[in-house]
Amino acid sequence: MLARMSFALLCACLVATPALAKNKTDFSCTGVFGPDSSEALLIETYGADNVVTGQVPGAEGMEAQATTVFPNDPDKAMQFGWMDNEARQGLGYVDLPPSIDGPHGVHVGMTVAEVLAINGKPFAIGGFWWDYGGYAQIAEGTLANADDATCFLSLRFSPADDYQPDLDTSSVAGEVSIPTDEPLLEKLDTRVSTVSVSFPDVGD
């Protein structure tokens, strides 16, 4: 679990922003999405039949414990990781579903161009097709790191599965940094595949 959590927090630090709660498209790091969240609160909020805790796949073939809400509904499924696995409380991260907008309105399914429009500044994306690929690396703009943020936003991008077989994708594969003006991103129909909000470990 420590490996899964450390990875989630590391990726979150690449794209950090304070969460607001002013309108429909803003996200608030409070309640079930706040640092004091717990499995008990999820059950109270969503119902016991919709909350399942167990092992979930992680990077490099590892598994970690997490709580999934609405596990049988891809449009609503949310995954929660806990700072305290035994008590299942203290939110470490939550992966948001396509039906919920994250901070500043970002959500699963957005194109690179759409995220770029929100950010207002170019950024980079890690190369694809490996365990740690596809994460946004944003240094400037609306979604850039905020030192005083109470929670952190991490975006992961993925290319479409069905692209032209003769397309040379070597420049966007593996441990490389891809600028947002790379034409291949559009040709591959690259979109946000994960919107994750994480919290710092207050014990660090």
Question: What does each model-found stretch correspond to?
Answer:
Residues 16-18:
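N-terminal signal peptide c-region/cleavage motif recognized by signal peptidases
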Residues 1-7:
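Bacterial N-terminal signal peptides that target proteins for export
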Residues 20-204:
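Short helix/turn-capping signatures at newly exposed starts of structured segments
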